[in-house]
Amino acid sequence: VQSPEDWERDELKKMPLTEDQYAEFLGIEHFYPPKGFSPLESLRFAPTLEFNGMGGGYQGEGSKTVIHSEAFVKITCRLVPNQTADEITRLVKEVIESRCPPQVRVEVKVTGGGDPYVVIPPGKPGADFDSPALLKKAFAAAENRIEEAFGTHPIYLREGGSIPIIGDLKRVAGLDSLLIGLFTNEDNLHAPNESFHLGIMNKAIDAFEKFFLDLVDR
């Protein structure tokens, strides 16, 4: 697993969120981050093995003396640079199958995946030495227009996501992607009662209009 650069850790410290606030938001008392990472760093920089859902047996109201014959669990993995979806899928499948007791049958179904993608802002440690001129222009324009619209400089963070096509765009077409996140914790992203702040949306529309005009050769 590739360790983050010092400048990335410094960027994370600019987030207006403390570990205590995040624990309260999650409703937990303790974190268990991997070695070498703080809780908030592990959220941004470390790979994951996530249990998204479990089921089996009677799940209705009250009790029932039923011994179920099947159970399932849905898992996902967030990957980081130097990992590939095929390799991690193989390793996870091998571990699950190797630890299955002989009295139990296990079946692992793979439904999809994508390789990780990260783009380092030109000029930062870890960035490509020969960053394309358009990429440099895009980062500069994004910084200027976001700061103009929101009154604060953007923070560069890694964010877990499921957009495999951006990795394919880089691999096949050699094109980088600039992803701009505008959600807040209160938005309940991909959860019940998901929302998006209209004030943020209006500022973003103005910023993006000017951003795309900045990229045009005029």
Give short role names for the model-derived ranges.
Residues 1-195, 199-209, 216-217:
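Metal-dependent amide/peptide-bond hydrolase catalytic core
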